Design a protein with these regions (language model features):
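N-terminal glycine-rich, Lys/His-bearing helix-loop that initiates the first secondary-structure elements
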Residues: 181-224
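Zn2+-dependent peptidoglycan hydrolase active-site motif and core
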Residues: 63-107
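Generic short beta-strand
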Residues: 85, 141, 221-223
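A residue-level detector for short acidic-glycine micro-motifs
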Residues: 55, 71, 102-105, 128, ...
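Surface-exposed, glycine-biased beta-strand/turn segments
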Residues: 1-82, 119, 169-180
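Histidine-centered active-site/metal-ligand motif
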Residues: 48, 89, 102, 138-140
Length: 224
């Protein structure tokens, strides 16, 4: 269903690239690997640390900088990366890493740790749902300032309580793209909220408050 919606949106805007998601809270990470037991119950990794580019399977992915391959694996777990490549870069004395998730199995594993790539070289191609962790085809792109102790994986989503730590490790990918359309923080005004709800919601869903509540999502019978 989600892939269908993405395809329909792309048909409506054929010249646009569908992308977004840095620090976006998402309730879609349903595999057990995203959960842990905390002091107040189950905690879930929900805050997205990269940008997603929604493109068809087999779309080529190129490196933005000269790079060394430090990870090239097939992450086979459900709702994980599928084909995963992580590159190490050194630009103007700064060492950092870029992560490319949801690649095809064949293209990700065609690389070997230690391989050297030049700017513009092909990293791989996007995988389909059968090989990319059971997601609609897309590229998960992420920047890291350190690999910590990870060698064959790296978190792509964080626990909300740890957000400030992970923001310092994984800066906004839009620092590279500098595209105002990728700015994710948006605080709608009351008038904008009213206009949007009037356009998209039926009158039966109106809520009797003088000022509308700023509802960001629903969970079961609850509005959050």
């Amino acid at each position: 269903m989600f892939e269908f919606k993405i395809n329909q949106l792309q048909k409506q805007h054929p010249t646009k690239l569908i992308a977004d998601g840095y620090l976006e809270p998402r309730p879609i990470y349903t595999a057990a690997a995203y959960d842990k037991e905390g002091n107040t119950g189950t905690e879930s990794r929900t805050v997205h640390l990269g940008v997603d580019f929604w493109l068809p399977a087999q779309t080529p992915v190129l490196t933005l900088f000269d790079a060394e391959v430090v990870t090239a694996v097939h992450d086979t777990e459900h709702k994980q990366y599928g084909g995963l490549v992580i590159l190490k870069h050194k630009e103007d004395g700064l060492i950092f890493y870029t992560l490319y998730g949801h690649l095809s199995l064949a293209s990700a594993t065609a690389l070997t740790v230690g391989d050297i790539l030049k700017k513009g070289d092909k990293i791989g191609v996007l995988g389909n749902a059968k090989e990319n962790g059971q997601w609609a085809p897309h590229l998960h792109f992420q920047i890291m300032l350190t690999m910590l102790d990870y060698t064959i994986d790296f978190p792509g989503v964080a626990y909300p309580k740890q957000l400030q730590v992970w923001k310092s490790i994984c800066p906004d990918p839009n620092l590279l793209f500098k595209n105002p359309k990728l700015v994710t923080e948006y605080d709608a005004s009351i008038s904008e909220i009213i206009a949007f709800r009037g356009k998209h919601l039926g009158k039966s869903l109106s809520i009797s408050y003088q000022e509308p509540l700023h509802i960001v999502r629903g969970d079961g019978a609850y509005l959050i």
